[in-house]
């Protein structure tokens, strides 16, 4: 009798659990995965090459569109690399605002991850819970930058503007009566800081709700415990960073090991897993939600007590104020030069990395002294994680491949660049 050979299956790029445009070629023995070959490049937009023909400030909005779930964290790394080459000092208030919004971004990312990962594994309702909180976080983005996602709020030398004193309010519409509207606008009567502090008070209970839905859920544990196990040694050898590395038991976090901005002034813990499976990585990210909430509360308290400038006063790097620009010739010249030519960065090279929600997001910048980068290299955390897809899914069932993709938290904007 003829021997039945393994057969090959295309998974994605249209599959809803492919998290974008992942194409996996799976070699199967029945329903057991023998080999997984990820194909990337379907979302390649040549960001690194485009940056070579744009001034430093013009490339900033491209950063939002790399990992389009963790927008401000991408901007953060880019600005840190430029500041390293320029030798610019960032005002402390701007550093606190950056750290606060980086943590808001971390919560945004992890909420989408927990919703999508749960949905991939059959937990249908967690997505609705997660998106309820994401709405408030997008409102914070909107209040500070005018955009709900691609904020372009960070600047080399600080941030675009200070925190606003008012919050956008829901307006009268045909589908909401006055009573419902008043309840929705209840926590929007004060400043952005008031709104953030109100969110931080409510959020721990919301995280408890997510844990009630998943943590001790028998089906969730069956789908994640013992799936995609990575030992600490293999995690290091594979280049894992972020929750993927901490889930395997290694307490490595750039916010602690190589602190940037004011991370050395805020108090938080690094959650670490023990088993290195999908369930451990889930627990690590859930605890990160709580720790990010702690950091945001500390930043909000400091910002309330310490007014000050939010961008460097070096007008060769940051534009002068509108009032000065319209009344003073020197400021007008600075403004004109910045918006036509941009600033020139001294010759040299710099690498800046941030603890992105997905891992170590790095920007390697080479300058030849011009107003545009000579070379910009992006170190995407998801790239190293996806490379381990074959090792993590081998020997598991085809349904577990979805859980492994989910636990990696991959977004193709940053992997394909």
Curated annotation (Swiss-Prot):
Any GO MF annotation of the entry: quinone binding
Catalytic activity from the UniProt record: a quinone + NADH + 5 H(+)(in) = a quinol + NAD(+) + 4 H(+)(out)
Superkingdom field: Bacteria
Keywords: Cell inner membrane, Cell membrane, Membrane, NAD, Quinone, Translocase, Transport, Ubiquinone
Enzyme class: translocase
Keyword field contains Transport: yes
Gene3D superfamilies linked: Cytochrome-c3 Hydrogenase, chain B
Topology within the bilayer: Peripheral membrane protein
Family matches, as HAMAP family: NDH1_NuoD (MF_01358)
Name recorded for this polypeptide: NADH-quinone oxidoreductase subunit D
Organism: Methylibium petroleiphilum (strain ATCC BAA-1232 / LMG 22953 / PM1)
